A protein has these predicted regions:
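Non-catalytic interaction-recognition regions
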Residues: 1-202
Length: 202
């Protein structure tokens, strides 16, 4: 698998065509991705208009730390740094992976760091809520709850959540077959939304 930006499409079509004409058995794939741009400019190495990943991740971590320190928190300074790092790096990765890879992506800090909508901080918050519920369950049932009982899905949101969970395997397979990690990101976002509705109403 060759992964490049969209500008290399013709090159790989020609290379693969030549190899086929030569009788070379091919098990090759070119996976291309669209360009990422800032709101006011496109990244260009030739023009020197690039931001190094290290600089981008440092800025993301700083912005996450600002958000953490503005909220009322009982975290120690070390915990704040750990959370800021996880949220910052997650925000940058998710902002990239949640997009259709073959589209033009405009990166904005507002969207990447948003606590609402399809963003890493939103998903990380949902994960923290789910983990909190599981922690309380483990406190109450340290050996596990071995009582067997039929599971009755009485609320519509319970059924929607259960059906969505059953789609996980198909989503992973579709993402792998099509080289589209955004399918999995979309699945996770929909799951977080369903869980939030379930948490609030059931």
């Amino acid at each position: 698998i060759y992964v490049t930006d969209e500008r290399q499409q013709l090159h790989f079509k020609q290379v693969f065509a030549i190899l086929r004409k030569m009788g070379v058995p091919l098990n090759l794939k070119h996976v291309w991705f669209g360009l990422m741009r800032l709101p006011n400019a496109t990244f260009s190495t030739r023009q020197g208009n690039v931001i190094k990943l290290e600089v981008l991740l440092d800025e993301a971590e700083k912005r996450a730390m600002d958000i953490i320190q503005q909220s009322s928190t009982t975290l120690t300074p070390e915990q704040q740094r750990e959370v800021a790092r996880a949220v910052g790096i997650g925000a940058v990765k998710y902002a990239d992976l949640s997009q259709n890879p073959q589209s033009l992506v405009t990166f904005t800090w507002e969207k990447a760091m948003s606590l609402e909508g399809n963003s890493a901080p939103y998903l990380q918050y949902a994960y923290a809520r789910i983990s909190s519920v599981l922690d309380k369950y483990r406190e109450r049932f340290p050996q596990g709850d071995y009582t067997a009982f039929p599971l009755l899905l009485q609320e519509p949101v319970e059924r929607r959540l259960a059906v969505h969970l059953l789609r996980f395997d198909d989503t992973v397979l579709a993402a792998a077959r099509t080289y589209r990690p955004n399918y999995l990101a979309d699945y996770c976002y929909a799951l977080a939304q369903l869980y939030s509705t379930f948490y609030q109403n059931v």
